[in-house]
Amino acid sequence: AAPYVIFGAKVPPHWLAIGTILTVVGGIYGPKAFSSPAAAAPAATPAAAPSSEPELDVEKAINDFLASDKKE
């Protein structure tokens, strides 16, 4: 295979493939390897307080819609 010309230098395709693989692997595992263990464990967040709004009951809403549709 013919080499690619990058910034005036001839680069063989296999070097581009190796560089791509190393960049992807380094991007995934690099931050994990260089972070401290304390920073890796996020602080526990408190559970969300229940809101004053009632939760949406989807099944009831669908049944109400179907019932009103049948009346028409």
Curated annotation (Swiss-Prot):
GO cellular component: mitochondrial inner membrane; proton-transporting ATP synthase complex
GO biological process: proton motive force-driven ATP synthesis; proton transmembrane transport
Keywords: ATP synthesis, CF(0), Hydrogen ion transport, Ion transport, Membrane, Mitochondrion, Mitochondrion inner membrane, Transport
Subcellular locations according to the entry: Mitochondrion inner membrane
UniProt superkingdom: Eukaryota
Protein task: Mitochondrial membrane ATP synthase (F(1)F(0) ATP synthase or Complex V) produces ATP from ADP in the presence of a proton gradient across the membrane which is generated by electron transport complexes of the respiratory chain. F-type ATP synthases consist of two structural domains, F(1) - containing the extramembraneous catalytic core, and F(0) - containing the membrane proton channel, linked together by a central stalk and a peripheral stalk.
Record text on subunit structure and interactions: F-type ATP synthases have 2 components, the catalytic core F(1) and the membrane-embedded component F(0), linked together by a central stalk and a peripheral stalk. The central stalk, also called rotor shaft, is often seen as part of F(1). The peripheral stalk is seen as part of F(0). F(0) contains the membrane channel next to the rotor. F-type ATP synthases form dimers but each monomer functions independently in ATP generation.
Entry protein name: ATP synthase subunit L
Organism: Pichia angusta (Yeast)
Species classification: Eukaryota, Fungi, Dikarya, Ascomycota, Saccharomycotina
